[in-house]
Amino acid sequence: MLLCAALQVFPYILRATLFLSMTRSPTAGIVRRPFGRLADGREVDQFTLCNGRGLELSVIPLGGIVTALRCPDRDGRSANVVLGLRSLDDYLLRNHAHVGTIVGRYANRIAGGTFTLDGRTHALARNEGKNTLHGGPGGFGSRWWSIDALPLADDGCVAVELGLVSEDGDQGFPGRLEVSVRYTLTLLDEWCIDYRQTLIPSPLI
């Protein structure tokens, strides 16, 4: 059950924490399972984190998509509490609403698919008529993210870290962007999301 959400913003660091109420269940750890295959033959694996108290988070490298967040109710019955699709094909063909994805380089739409920065106008790839939505047709939500399962922390936290490099000119945006997103489940039944990026030079994000 979602109790509250806290959001803290720092320069180039964003951390969101969701606090959930649950009961103790299986051992903490990370399980990797096949989720599907892309047209180019790449296998897509799903990483499922469990904090040992019943909170489970599943994520895939395509778009950094969170496919499920399962937690038990007061009677111990587990349920997925985030919107998700049924299969990899659904995410590839029907995810027009960007369900579960990491949005970038820019969230929301840029009217006309252009913007001016430091006196220079940048023309962007468009994917909503004349507009650029959520980073364009090749935005972060459709990209392949690396996923590293991190060792179990001394405090019992379970985490994975996703990484992506967006080169200068990607979708028309200036500057090279190195971004990482860490998903952590804690023994306090929190799902923590940490965003970090390195900007060379500082582009629009």
Task: List the model feature ranges, each with a label.
Residues 10-12, 19:
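Aromatic (phenylalanine/tyrosine) cluster motif
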